[in-house]
Amino acid sequence: MTIQLDMYQTIAVAVVVLMLGNFLKHRIAILERFCIPAPVIGGVIFAIFTCVCYVTGFAEFSFDDILKEVCMVFFFTSVGFQANLKVLKSGGKSLIIFLILVIMLIICQNFLAVGLSKALQISPLVGLCTGSIPMIGGHGTAGAFGPVLEDFGVKGASTLCTAAATFGLIAGSIMGGPVGKRLIEKKNLLKTAIPEDNSLLIEEEKKHERHTSMYPAAVFQLIIAMGIGTIISKLLSMTGMTFPIYIGAMIAAAFMRNIGEYSGQFTIYMGEINDIGGISLSLFLGIAMITLKLWQLADLALPLITLLAGQTILMFLFTYFVIFNIMGRDYDAAV
């Protein structure tokens, strides 16, 4: 028996799953401590339910997830509006070094993913489902790139990427605190802690103040950036390279933000845009999670565990020996 849900029913189920996740997160301390997103909590429960229904032959669910892409582009467009060059410049040399280190980590993660997948005799594209896409990008990027990898022939790529992102979130939460604490105590770094100059951040926070009357304007700015983004995406596609659909919108949003910042001719309503982006992300993740097909992981269970274990070891070694040492071996570097 196949249970088909249209786009309205699909997003309604996603909202119910989101509400369930919020309910459980506020009542189960470990979920709050590890910062597990509410859509992931509720979505995993629902995905397990649909998996049991499928495996037992009771029912198979079919969703119309067309709104998932709309919510995804809304969210990543809101992220594009975060690109404020004034704030980036305030980071100075240390920010540039950190960005270079992150790029190095991304390269290492993908090399490891491809290398391990070849050793395990599986497709390198499957390995990439556990590389920088979920480990650096998180659930949002995992949900965006999953369909792209599926277009390249990786069956169940969305499920693989989402599973890896969930593991990465939990592993990072478990590992981050103890590693930072060990470095601080072992190197006696508390004495190197320097109070930060938060003047620019305070100024930036003022731009994030919310006004109810400005939410329509924020929606319009997001839609304009998305519209311009489609043109940019078409131009990028002419290069022959494959980009996620949201890249053009992110670029357009970044340009709009900085033109507004430097010209002073118009205001970007960042607080309202952040709120709309947050709602869009929750709906996007909700739809992405309820459409997971966990049974597709069965044949790749052992390789997936091996790949994720390798990524965990890499992350520990890179943060402990590379990032800490290059970023100055002080309190800020440890944190």
Which positions does each model-derived feature cover?
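Structural signature of hydrophobic alpha-helical transmembrane segments
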Residues: 2-16, 62-75, 125-132, 240-252, ...
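Entry/N-cap segments of selected transmembrane alpha helices
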Residues: 84-114, 219-222, 275, 290-320
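Flexible hinge motifs at transmembrane-helix junctions and intramembrane kinks/re-entrant loops
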Residues: 24-40, 52, 57, 61, ...
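Transmembrane alpha-helices that form the ion-translocation and gating core
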Residues: 99-145, 305-335
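Juxtamembrane and boundary regions of transmembrane helices in multi-pass small-molecule transporters
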Residues: 115-122, 165-203, 321-329
